[in-house]
């Protein structure tokens, strides 16, 4: 519904009914909140185009989503009623990866072009924690091999960052860029079954499928690209990375998400004395 005319007749009551319909049909609370935000943005644009009344827009904007603290109560009620609680894009729970499994995934055959690409692909997610969309968008020119840095754009927070590459990631970047990467543009080349690497470009979906394939080889069945970011953040939190540094390095716009990793990394019974 990107055409303003398509929004004629959309009311706050319709928006509220849409929220309730999603609740009854098992959509995740986060997904519902995201869709509500999208509806409000488009309703505002439609109002500017004259398709939605200003008063109606005010009422639509007043429709509230669900706060994080409400989610458990909402989901408990839905479970009791036999309604699903996780219909949406994300998995209900991340697949946990051990340090040994992560190391095994990074141990690629660097005598092949596919192995060199996979090693860099995995290193960027496991060692730098980039989102899969950010990884897919990386350009050859984003890598400064001389200074060991990666300069890239984070669309989710609309900012460009520079990250220092650790020794493993820098080595992987040198191996792939000097031997296999395109001269300019998107750095990745897709796989051609039985023939190594093919044409330029890998979608976020293709990267996730590759991660899933490589994860299964080390016993991490169902692994996704987001799980690699989860692993990175978890390891950073467990090694006492300050909250503000984790927020910046992970490209989060608020302290809420990195704060969860810090909280989860705490030893719950630390300081408890029984004698």
Region roles according to the model:
Residues 1-275:
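Conserved catalytic core of the tyrosine transesterase superfamily
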């Amino acid at each position: 519904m990107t055409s303003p005319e398509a929004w004629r007749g959309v009311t706050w009551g319709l928006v509220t009914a849409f929220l309730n319909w999603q609740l009854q049909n098992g959509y995740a609370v986060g997904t519902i909140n995201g869709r509500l935000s999208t509806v409000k943005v488009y309703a505002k644009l439609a109002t500017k185009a004259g398709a939605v009344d200003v008063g109606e827009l005010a009422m639509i904007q007043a429709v509230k989503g669900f706060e994080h603290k409400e989610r458990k109560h909402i989901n408990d009620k839905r479970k009791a009623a036999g309604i699903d609680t996780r219909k949406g894009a994300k998995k209900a729970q991340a697949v946990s990866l051990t340090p040994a499994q992560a190391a095994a995934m990074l141990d690629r055959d660097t005598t092949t072009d596919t192995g060199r690409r996979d090693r860099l692909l995995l290193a960027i997610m496991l060692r730098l924690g980039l989102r899969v969309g950010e990884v897919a968008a990386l350009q050859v020119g984003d890598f400064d091999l001389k200074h060991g840095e990666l300069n890239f754009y984070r669309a989710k927070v609309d900012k460009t960052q520079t990250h220092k590459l650790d020794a493993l990631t820098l080595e992987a970047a040198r191996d792939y860029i000097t031997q296999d990467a395109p001269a300019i543009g998107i750095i990745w080349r897709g796989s051609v079954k039985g023939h190594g690497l093919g044409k330029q470009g890998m979608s976020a979906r293709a990267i996730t499928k590759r991660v899933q394939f490589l994860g299964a080889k080390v016993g991490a069945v169902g692994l996704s690209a987001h799980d690699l970011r989860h692993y990175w953040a978890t390891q950073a939190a467990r090694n006492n990375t300050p909250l503000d540094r984790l927020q910046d390095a992970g490209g989060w716009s608020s302290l809420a998400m990195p704060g969860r990793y810090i909280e989860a990394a705490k030893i719950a019974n630390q300081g408890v004395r029984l004698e």
